[in-house]
């Protein structure tokens, strides 16, 4: 990740709005959209393809580009061959995320809702917040630039060489990451309200950087029954937290205590005055084999044997 690419959230706050999609989908009265048209919240919760659409903005540079691509996609009825040649790649991307007629109808209504909210409230709010939190963003940038050399070997060995870190107003400990290519990664992390919490985005960066390692550790060590019953999938959030803590302890140990306290707070657990490691480990429990594999892979990525 290139420190120079650290930037504020995408235009119109689209990342924030998509991250809070279930809440946004609930309030569509101003559009004249009734419950008989489509249940946006239910579809978001039930359809994996739709929920993966939260990563859609990471492929674009602006809200206008998202609108252009979705309009072309809907006009083509989801068929890339029916779109203009210059937009076929974008239409194909959308078709992979929203393959059915019902999915396309959901997308049409949702983009309409986002545009309406942006026009009536969110864009001006977003502009004001970017102005108010500029000192925080600058402090985060400075901290990341100072720490990035310590992460460099891990970034290189995990094929996350370059990309952008995007600061978001609404995301907490769970970031959003697109690993399109070794030199094209987009990571969305929290934007704190004050410089007192300047390290929080770095905690989330570490959490996001270990996602692939965490998935490998789970896949290699979960039993067939755990894979079949969905238990293995449930390990993923915890494995990312545990792996992020391991990475932080190796490359920036001075941030280790803060990392654990941050993620305990995110989990609704009040961090103790002392003994935070024990509480952290008991809160984010994993099978021993997965923990050991996480440690092994992180050590290897940092150049260990």
Report the location of each language-model feature:
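Active-site scaffold of zinc-dependent metalloenzymes
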Residues: 92, 174-209
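Extended, compositionally biased non-globular segments
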Residues: 227-270
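Soluble non-cytosolic domains of exported or imported proteins
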Residues: 138-145, 200, 234, 238
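N-terminal low-structure segments adjacent to metalloprotease catalytic domains
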Residues: 1-121
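Active-site recognition of the HExxH zinc-binding catalytic motif
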Residues: 199-224, 238-246
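Auxiliary, metal-adjacent structural segments of Zn-dependent hydrolase domains
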Residues: 122-183, 254
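Pan-zinc metallopeptidase signature
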Residues: 256-305
């Amino acid at each position: 990740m290139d420190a120079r690419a650290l930037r504020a959230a995408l235009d119109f706050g689209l990342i924030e709005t998509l991250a809070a999609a279930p809440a946004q989908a609930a309030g569509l009265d101003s559009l004249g959209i009734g419950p008989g048209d489509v249940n946006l919240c239910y579809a978001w919760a039930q359809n994996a393809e739709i929920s993966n659409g939260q990563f859609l903005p990471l492929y674009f540079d602006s809200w206008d580009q998202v609108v252009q691509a979705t309009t072309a996609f809907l006009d083509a009825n989801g068929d890339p061959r029916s779109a203009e040649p210059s937009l076929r790649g974008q239409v194909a991307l959308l078709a992979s995320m929203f393959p059915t007629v019902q999915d396309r109808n959901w997308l049409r209504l949702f983009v309409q809702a986002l545009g309406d909210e942006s026009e009536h409230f969110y864009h001006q709010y977003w502009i004001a917040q970017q102005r108010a939190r500029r000192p925080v963003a600058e402090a985060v940038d400075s901290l990341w630039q100072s720490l990035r050399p310590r992460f460099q070997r891990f970034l290189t060995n995990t094929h996350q060489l370059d990309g952008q870190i995007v600061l978001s107003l609404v995301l907490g400990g769970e970031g959003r990451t697109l690993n399109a290519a070794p030199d094209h990664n987009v990571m969305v992390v929290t934007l704190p309200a004050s410089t007192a919490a300047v390290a929080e985005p770095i905690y989330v960066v570490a959490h996001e950087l270990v996602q692939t390692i965490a998935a490998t550790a789970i896949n290699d060590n979960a039993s067939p029954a755990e894979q079949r019953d969905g238990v293995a999938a449930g390990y993923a959030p915890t494995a990312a937290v545990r792996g992020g803590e391991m990475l932080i302890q190796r490359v920036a140990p001075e941030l280790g205590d803060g990392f654990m306290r941050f993620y305990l707070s995110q989990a609704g657990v009040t961090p103790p005055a002392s003994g935070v490691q024990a509480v952290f480990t008991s809160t984010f429990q994993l099978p021993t084999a997965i923990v050991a594999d996480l440690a092994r892979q992180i050590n290897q990525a940092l150049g260990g044997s």
